[in-house]
């Protein structure tokens, strides 16, 4: 503390010294002068300070000061001093505890050890942020702005002035900026550099890159060249806001400009060169670039402007021109306005709107060279352009001077020029073809103009500007409209001269000036060069005058309309212009116009209006250009020049109009509800609610004044005259039962000039003179009021008597009578007809419930008064009882009120019934319409499905050819005779307007909406797209239901209070022990019931809004997109809470029902309700998936067994004893039991296990383990037995060698199936293995549980249990691999081939095919193929019967009536018999023998119905034998039958004994254990495969490209016609190929197919005896036959990802197929060409240009060609070295 005291003492001393120094400083003269100066300045700004100072001085000079005044002054001074001194308060000292609370905060890097190094590093880091584009931009702009760094910051996005200064001085020595500075004269005074202009910023400002992921695909388009800006093919940015003024674009719209247009325009602007192509020498002083585009040029359509710019040879991002180019441009504009024949013919034949890029020209040359003849139709399809356009470009590139499509008239004849230019420019003159030259031919021969390139001094020009691709072409129908508009405007002589500007050099008819066009072309400049030099001085004076005018005038360009930014245009004295309408809230006053002038012109009444369909596509809407713009803006604040017929017409109207006459401005009727929607019609398309409120004059033949519909009295219309201040007066409500119609003064209707006649049907007015329920109610109330007035004297006497008894009650009755009168007045007002045609409200307002007359006892105010204690309610009835007269009067009064209430209730009931009937009728109509639509949709769908089924096979055969043709040339779906609109891509229409694929042309198809590029049809700020319209509609529906919910809730609360009041009032009356009237209580009860019923209806009505709002919430998840008010959001929250509370009991009930259903399905007998709802576990899902896999595996085995056994139906000489083969899927009854949906599942057993006691759990676990072991041993024994009998070829003493086994495959192919197992890899790795065996590894094995054996091994080939488990896991992995059915069929076809594969052998010449001869079965036999799925009712009955095994089936087969049903049933029986041994196939043998007999004797009668009847008889005999048999069934069959019955009837499980239940549990435990083991093996195999796939492949030199999509590649085969068109096979399948599972198909008979027999070739080394190749029923397109070399083979179709050459599974490949080690360069390699599709997806990496902006990754992957499609691919022989 002593240290603190010393510190405090030192502080006080220093503070005192500071105060002394401060006082001395304040007394100095400098301080006083400073204070005096600032005091004077402050007092001049704030006079009250001066008054306060003078008051203080006056009080100080006073001799006597009163005590109170002195105190107040001193207090005020003290307060001021305290305020001044309290600004900086002295901080207090810290205490000991606060000082101990200080903690040390470590901040690494806060101490700089080497400041110079850190500073240098920071500078380098800041310099590294500069991209190359930013560096070049800074260097180019530095030369113009020197060191105005704050101005240079305008060109950058994220750079400050300090960054620019640092960059400048750090690169000053290396870049040498001073060499680019313009040399200036030395001046004495420093002159500030020029700040960047608006035009310069428009060209050079760097904009942030676009986030293409936030925009729809191919939705961004360059505003100038109309090419797609997607960030891959073409980059672009948003246009700077400064460019909107330069290019005359609406500032409310965001426009995109591509990088090419910006670079081209910036290059021309930087060099200060003319944008045109007609000036030959810009060094001349007369050709300075200082002329803007004429102001009227923006009024032309896009097509006309593109035509003029191409004729001028100018780029389309044009801003300024020289004098010759400007004169030529003005002359052509006048020719178009005057509709000269020559230029109109050129305009009609104009097709050069879209320019050709260099890539397109190269592609055109390639297509022409590849075409044997000049087939322009096919070339145009490849180019995505019109044939005529391709031919024109071809002629232009070859320099062929044919008849040009566009002819330009450079100037008049030389004779006319020499004579002094007497001929006018607009007069068409005939000239020879030699005097004219084609603009397209001249521009095609000119090279690309480069900046700062010197131009030739004399002769014609040889260089020109490259025209860019332009806007969307104008369709043919729009061109016709444009011609019609020109013809209409041609009737007005003065309208055609309104487009000449003041600064134009073109001749004019008004001033009669001669033509000054001598220097507007290179010819005129070359001929009159000397005259130009002599007239330099005169031209300079004219240019200076024109420059002054052009500076003030806004800059106009090609694709820009008039500026809508609200600025005023320059007012030219000779031709006054009409101001464009502004988008601001206060529009400027329009120009006056004569209302009667139109009648004197044509004698027609132009009171028609143009109807605009808001839902129409933008391309078909009338654009506000030329003659249609004044139609849209007819009811707005002004118009353009063309809206009033051109400048000449405007001037003529102003001259003919008297001075005193002034036309009234247009009138706009707006209501309070539509105040926010007030906007100009020509700026935005009117919405239905706003557009309907504008005055619409109807077209009539008589002089009937227009009728305006006045809105209801609630929303009094306010007539606002544009240009004048609105007068706000007191709104007075007028009531009239009839329709309110007021004539509008003729002066308020704006005149329309040069408007084509439009027929507008007037809106029919609905009559309201008929009687309505509301009017009848009004008359009834009026009669009641008259009766009450007649009874008023009697009631007054009663009231006097009542007042003597109870004055308070009398006052209450008087108040109630006043309320009744007010209600009647309100009803009278509500009964009047009010409404509006425009707003959509009905003329007959419905009566609200709260407006009805209420009864005395049901009134809330009356009940509240009666319930109040101060009125002494019990005393009143006693007083009435004492006077019988008063009692009678009271009863009469109550009865009257009851009658009134009854009438009111009846009226309300009638209205409610009418409303319900209307709603029911509307709902019925809507339901009928929906049913009709559904019926039509179903019929259309059925029709489409039928057509699709008919065309399936044809499309399949043409699929391969169509795919190959699609890669090169797309098919021409649109005939060549159909002429598409100009600029529309044919391929785009072929793909149904879906630009999903990248076009081959650099110019994209013109599928953009015209509203985005056309001048007159731009998308206004108020117009929304489809999504916004949908959101708006949803918002309206949402608000409508929210308000309905709010109203119903309020009504429900009101009814609830009413019910409570009635209950309370009834209880009080009954408790008062007074004699009361039963009728009153009856009425109160009735009212209570009505309120309760209404509340129930309200609850039902609230369900629909709640469901609708819940659906909207599920769709959007957030209501912020609708921008609701706070009250609506609260109501929305209440609705959702209410809906959730209502749905919660239903959800709980559903969960409980599901739980009870699950318990009922349990066969163990669990009935306890305390168990929770059982959820599906991952283990259960895995078991279900495994069951499905088992079913598929079982079907695959049966199909293969059927194919193998049907082929070997012929009896053998020495038949081996048949042993019953029990498959895994058939021998396990527990497995079939578990597959039943209602069977006991593992989760049920788990519940039982948890419910046991600990001792019982251990016992049950031991039993389970024992049973599992016994069951596994039994299954293993059965499987080994099956393998032994299925694979035992002969006795062990007669074992054959490997070669002999291969040779004996034809005799017993079923015995050699095991060679396809995994253990046969030893044989496959060597030589002499059949390719069919090697190829069979890529598909599933054919026999369950069969292990492969080695031929050269000394053992018998039987595998152990571990081998079996391993093989089972491998088979599961192969069988259930997600493969396409098409690929499965292809593999099946490949299996049938026994040819030699060069990929499987080292030397293909050592093995050759040996063919035994034709098959024994005739090729013409027709066979019935087995099918599984039923198609008819008989088939379904047959399937249910066949589901029971034959040895357990007690019922016989029902007979059928038709041949088709018999064929279906027989095919299903054949399918079921295929699962059984060959000895049990009775039906199959019967059908085969009948078919063979029919084939041997074609004349004999053959019918499948007779065969089926024979089968039915045999089945009946079998049933009789089973009934007569008394033998005891075997235990296994007995168990199967019992389990089958238990599956069909699960309820029998409850009747079982404990021992039977325990047995079932044990079987279930066995099945669960087996499934878990198989699932674990399957998961292990999948994990192993995933690890192998994820293993990095360092084999880079011969790495095979494997795209994600399935690739069809060739596989060798010797059978030429391996794919047939027939749907069924005529011969049996091969021995080594399984039959894959097919979808259910109808039994069909295939026609006999000729079989091509391969020739037999002798083999010197090894003879491989194989089965003859057979075609398969594969639904694939027919592939072309590939001719091969003698050692080559034809190709088949397969999947590249098969295990035959899969590098990802090296352990499954033979040694010669494994890839070598990464470092081993000596090992041989096998190369396989996988370029099958011709395209491989390659991701293009885009470098980040701006590090500070986060760019989303672009998901679009360009397609990179790696060669043509696989055609005529021939495999070469691969030697060992290769």
UniProtKB/Swiss-Prot annotation:
Keywords: DNA-binding, Nucleus, Repressor, Transcription, Transcription regulation. In larvae, expressed in pharyngeal neurons, ventral and dorsal nerve cords, tail neurons, egg-laying neurons and egg-laying muscles. Detected in the neurons of the pharyngeal nerve ring, head neurons, tail neurons and egg-laying muscles in adults. Detected in male-specific tail ganglia and rays in males. Residues 409-671, 992-1024, 1195-1218, 1276-1339, 1414-1434, 1646-1718 are annotated as: Disordered. Disruption phenotype: Mutant animals display a progressive defect in locomotion starting at the L2 stage, showing delayed response to prodding, irregular thrashing movements and a low pharyngeal pumping rate. Worms have shorter body length, convoluted intestine and develop gonadogenesis defects including loss of spermathecae, sterility and larval arrest at L4 stage. They also show abnormal cholinergic signaling leading to early onset of paralysis in the presence of aldicarb, an acetylcholinesterase inhibitor. RNAi-mediated knockdown results in enlargement of mitochondria in the body wall muscle. Residues 125-176 form the SANT domain. It is found in: Nucleus. Mediates transcriptional repression by certain nuclear receptors. Plays a role in development and neuronal function. May play a role in muscle-specific oxidative mitochondrial metabolism. This is Nuclear receptor corepressor 1. The lineage of its organism: Eukaryota, Metazoa, Ecdysozoa, Nematoda, Chromadorea.
């Amino acid at each position: 503390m002593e240290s603190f005291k010393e510190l405090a003492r030192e502080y006080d001393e220093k503070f005192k010294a500071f105060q002394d120094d401060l006082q001395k400083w304040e007394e100095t003269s400098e301080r006083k002068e400073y204070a005096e100066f600032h005091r004077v300045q402050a007092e001049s700004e704030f006079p009250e300070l001066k008054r306060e100072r003078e008051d203080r001085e006056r009080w100080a000079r006073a001799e006597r000061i009163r005590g109170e005044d002195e105190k107040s002054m001193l207090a005020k001074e003290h307060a001021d001093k305290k305020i001044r001194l309290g600004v900086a308060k002295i901080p207090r000292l810290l205490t000991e505890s606060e000082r101990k609370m200080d903690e040390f905060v470590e901040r690494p890097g806060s101490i700089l050890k080497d400041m110079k190094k850190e500073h240098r590093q920071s500078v380098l880091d800041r310099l590294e942020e500069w991209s190359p584009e930013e560096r070049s931009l800074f260097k180019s702009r530095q030369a113009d702005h020197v060191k105005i760094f704050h101005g240079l910051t305008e060109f950058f996005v994220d750079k400050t002035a300090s960054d620019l200064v640092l960059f400048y001085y750090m690169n000053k020595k290396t870049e040498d900026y001073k060499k680019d500075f313009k040399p200036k004269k030395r001046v004495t005074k420093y002159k500030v550099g020029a700040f960047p202009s608006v035009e310069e910023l428009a060209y050079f400002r760097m904009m942030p890159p676009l986030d293409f992921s936030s925009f729809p695909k191919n939705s961004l388009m360059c505003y100038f060249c109309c090419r797609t800006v997607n960030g891959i093919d073409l980059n672009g940015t948003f246009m700077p806001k400064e460019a909107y003024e330069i290019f005359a674009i609406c500032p409310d719209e965001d426009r995109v400009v591509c990088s090419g247009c910006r670079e081209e325009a910036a290059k021309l602007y930087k060099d200060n060169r003319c944008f045109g192509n007609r000036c030959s020498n810009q060094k001349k002083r007369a050709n300075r670039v200082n002329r803007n585009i004429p102001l009227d040029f923006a009024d032309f359509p896009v097509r006309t402007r593109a035509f003029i710019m191409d004729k001028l040879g100018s780029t389309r991002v044009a801003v300024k021109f020289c004098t010759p180019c400007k004169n030529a441009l003005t002359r052509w504009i006048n020719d178009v306005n005057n509709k000269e024949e020559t230029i109109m013919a050129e305009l009609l034949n104009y097709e050069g709107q879209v320019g050709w890029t260099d890539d397109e020209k190269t592609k055109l040359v390639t297509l022409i060279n590849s075409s044997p003849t000049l087939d322009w139709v096919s070339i145009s399809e490849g180019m995505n352009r019109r044939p005529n356009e391709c031919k024109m470009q071809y002629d232009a590139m070859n320099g062929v001077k044919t008849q040009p499509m566009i002819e330009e008239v450079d100037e008049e004849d030389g004779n006319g020029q020499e004579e002094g230019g007497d001929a006018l420019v607009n007069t068409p003159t005939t000239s020879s073809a030699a005097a004219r030259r084609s603009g397209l031919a001249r521009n095609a021969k000119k090279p690309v103009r480069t900046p700062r390139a010197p131009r030739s001094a004399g002769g014609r020009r040889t260089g020109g500007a490259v025209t860019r691709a332009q806007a969307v072409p104008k369709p043919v129908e729009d061109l016709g409209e444009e011609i019609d508009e020109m013809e209409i405007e041609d009737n007005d002589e003065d309208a055609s001269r309104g487009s000449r500007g003041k600064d134009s050099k073109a001749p004019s008819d008004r001033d009669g000036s001669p033509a000054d066009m001598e220097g507007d072309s290179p010819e005129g400049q070359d001929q009159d060069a000397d005259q130009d030099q002599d007239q330099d001085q005169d031209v300079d004076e004219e240019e200076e005058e024109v420059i002054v005018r052009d500076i003030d005038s806004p800059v106009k360009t090609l694709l820009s309309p008039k500026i809508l930014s609200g600025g005023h245009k320059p007012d030219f004295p000779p031709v006054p212009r009409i101001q464009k309408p502004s988008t601001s809230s206060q529009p400027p006053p329009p120009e006056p116009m004569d209302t009667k002038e139109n009648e004197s012109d044509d004698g027609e009444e132009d009171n028609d209006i143009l109807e605009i369909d808001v839902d129409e596509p933008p391309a078909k809407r009338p654009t506000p250009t030329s003659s249609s713009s004044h139609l849209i803006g007819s009811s707005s604040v002004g118009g353009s020049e063309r809206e009033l017929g051109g400048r000449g017409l405007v001037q003529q109207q102003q001259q003919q109009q008297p001075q005193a006459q002034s036309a009234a401005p247009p009138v706009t009727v707006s209501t309070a509800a539509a105040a926010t929607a007030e906007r100009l019609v020509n700026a935005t398309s009117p919405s239905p609610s706003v557009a309907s409120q504008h005055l619409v004059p109807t077209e009539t033949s008589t002089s009937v004044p227009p009728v305006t519909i006045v809105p209801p009295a609630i929303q009094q219309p306010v007539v606002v005259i544009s240009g004048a201040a609105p007068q706000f007066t007191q709104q007075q409500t007028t009531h009239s039962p009839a329709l309110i119609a007021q004539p509008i003064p003729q002066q308020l209707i704006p005149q329309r000039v040069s408007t084509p006649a439009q027929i507008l049907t007037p809106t029919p007015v609905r009559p309201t003179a008929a009687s309505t329920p509301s009017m009848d109610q009004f008359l009834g109330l009026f009669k009641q009021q008259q009766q009450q007035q007649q009874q008023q004297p009697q009631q007054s006497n009663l009231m006097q008597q009542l007042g003597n008894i109870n004055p308070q009650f009398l006052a209450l009755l008087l108040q109630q009578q006043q309320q009744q009168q007010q209600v009647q007045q309100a009803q009278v007002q509500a009964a009047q007809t009010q409404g509006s045609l425009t707003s959509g409200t009905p003329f007959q307002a419905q009566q609200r419930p709260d407006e009805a007359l209420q009864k005395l006892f049901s009134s809330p105010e009356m009940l509240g008064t009666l319930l109040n204690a101060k009125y002494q309610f019990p005393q009143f009835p006693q007083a009435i009882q004492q006077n019988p007269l008063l009692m009678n009067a009271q009863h009469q009064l109550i009865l009257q009120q009851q009658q009134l209430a009854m009438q009111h209730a009846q009226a309300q009931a009638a209205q409610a019934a009418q409303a319900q009937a209307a709603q029911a009728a509307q709902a019925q109509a809507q339901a009928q319409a929906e049913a009709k639509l559904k019926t039509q949709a179903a019929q259309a769908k059925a029709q489409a499905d039928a057509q699709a089924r008919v065309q399936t096979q044809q499309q399949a055969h043409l699929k391969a050819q169509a795919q190959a043709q699609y890669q090169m040339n797309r098919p021409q779906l649109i005939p060549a005779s159909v002429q598409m609109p100009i600029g529309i891509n044919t391929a785009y229409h072929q793909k149904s307007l879906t630009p999903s694929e990248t076009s081959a042309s650099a110019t994209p198809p013109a599928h953009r909406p015209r509203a985005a590029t056309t001048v007159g049809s731009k998308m206004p700020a108020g117009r929304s797209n489809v999504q916004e319209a949908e959101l708006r509609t949803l918002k309206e529906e949402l608000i409508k239901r929210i308000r309905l919910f709010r109203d119903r809730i309020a009504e429900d609360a009101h009814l609830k209070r009413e019910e409570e009041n009635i209950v309370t009032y009834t209880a009080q009356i009954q408790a008062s022990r007074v004699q009361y009237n039963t009728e009153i209580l009856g009425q109160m009860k009735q009212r209570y019931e009505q309120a309760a019923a209404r509340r129930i209806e309200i609850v039902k009505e609230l369900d629909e809004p709640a469901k609708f709002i819940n659906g909207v919430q599920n769709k959007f998840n957030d209501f912020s997109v609708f921008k609701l008010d706070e009250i609506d959001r609260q109501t929305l929250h209440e609705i959702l809470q209410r809906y959730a509370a209502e749905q919660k009991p239903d959800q709980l009930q559903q969960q409980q029902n599901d739980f009870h259903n699950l318990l009922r399905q349990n066969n163990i007998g669990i009935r306890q309700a305390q168990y929770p709802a059982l959820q599906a576990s991952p283990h259960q899902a895995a078991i279900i998936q495994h069951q499905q896999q088992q079913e598929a595996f079982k079907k695959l085995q049966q199909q293969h067994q059927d194919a193998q056994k049907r082929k070997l139906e012929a009896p053998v000489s020495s038949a081996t004893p048949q042993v019953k083969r029990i498959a895994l899927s058939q021998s396990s009854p527990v497995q079939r039991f578990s597959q039943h949906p209602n069977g006991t599942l593992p989760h049920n057993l788990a519940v039982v296990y948890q419910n046991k006691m600990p001792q019982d759990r251990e016992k049950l676990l031991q039993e389970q383990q024992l049973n599992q072991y016994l069951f596994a041993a039994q299954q293993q024994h059965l499987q080994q037995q099956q393998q032994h009998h299925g694979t035992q070829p002969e006795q062990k003493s007669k074992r054959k060698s490997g070669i002999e086994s291969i040779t004996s495959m034809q005799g017993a192919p079923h015995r050699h199936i095991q060679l396809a197992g995994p253990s046969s890899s030893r044989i496959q790795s060597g030589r002499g293995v059949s390719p069919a065996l090697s190829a069979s590894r890529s598909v599933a094995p054919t026999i369950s549980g069969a292990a492969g054996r080695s031929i050269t091994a000394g053992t018998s080939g039987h595998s152990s249990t571990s081998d079996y488990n391993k093989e089972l896991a491998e088979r599961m992995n192969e069988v259930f691999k997600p493969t396409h059915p098409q690929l499965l069929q292809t593999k099946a076809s490949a299996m049938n081939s026994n040819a030699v594969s060069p990929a499987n052998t080292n030397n293909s010449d050592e093995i050759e095919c040996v063919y035994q001869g034709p098959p024994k079965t005739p090729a013409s036999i027709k066979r019935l193929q087995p099918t599984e799925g039923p198609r008819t009712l008989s088939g379904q009955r047959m399937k249910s019967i066949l589901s029971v095994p034959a040895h357990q089936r007690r019922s016989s087969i029902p007979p059928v009536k038709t041949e088709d049903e018999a064929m279906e049933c027989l095919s299903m029986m054949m399918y079921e018999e295929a699962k059984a041994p060959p000895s049990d196939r009775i039906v199959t043998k019967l059908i085969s023998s009948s078919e063979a007999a029919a084939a041997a004797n074609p004349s004999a009668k053959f019918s499948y119905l007779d065969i089926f009847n024979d089968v039915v008889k045999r089945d009946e005999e079998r049933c009789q034998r089973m009934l007569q048999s008394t033998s005891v069934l075997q235990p296994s069959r007995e168990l199967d039958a019992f389990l089958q019955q238990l599956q069909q009837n699960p309820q029998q499980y409850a009747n079982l004994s404990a021992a039977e239940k325990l047995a079932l549990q044990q079987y279930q435990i066995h099945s669960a254990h087996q499934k878990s083991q198989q699932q674990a093996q399957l998961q292990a195999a999948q994990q192993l495969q995933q690890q192998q796939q994820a293993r990095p492949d360092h084999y880079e030199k011969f790495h095979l490209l494997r795209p994600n999509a399935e690739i069809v590649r060739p596989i060798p085969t010797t059978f030429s016609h391996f794919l047939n068109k027939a749907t069924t096979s005529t011969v049996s399948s091969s021995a080594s190929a399984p039959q894959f599972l097919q979808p259910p198909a109808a039994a069909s008979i295939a026609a006999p197919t000729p079989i091509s027999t391969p020739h037999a070739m002798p083999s010197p080394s090894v003879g491989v005896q194989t089965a003859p190749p057979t075609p398969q029923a594969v639904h694939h397109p027919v592939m072309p036959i590939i001719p091969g070399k003698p050692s080559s083979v034809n190709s088949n179709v397969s999947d590249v990802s098969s295990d035959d050459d899969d590098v990802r599974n090296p352990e499954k490949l033979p040694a010669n197929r494994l890839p070598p080690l990464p470092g081993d360069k000596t090992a041989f390699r096998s190369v396989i060409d996988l370029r099958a599709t011709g395209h491989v997806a390659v991701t293009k990496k885009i470098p980040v240009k701006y590090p500070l902006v986060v760019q989303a990754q672009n998901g679009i992957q360009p397609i990179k060609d790696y060669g043509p499609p696989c055609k005529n691919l021939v495999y070469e022989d691969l030697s060992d070295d290769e």
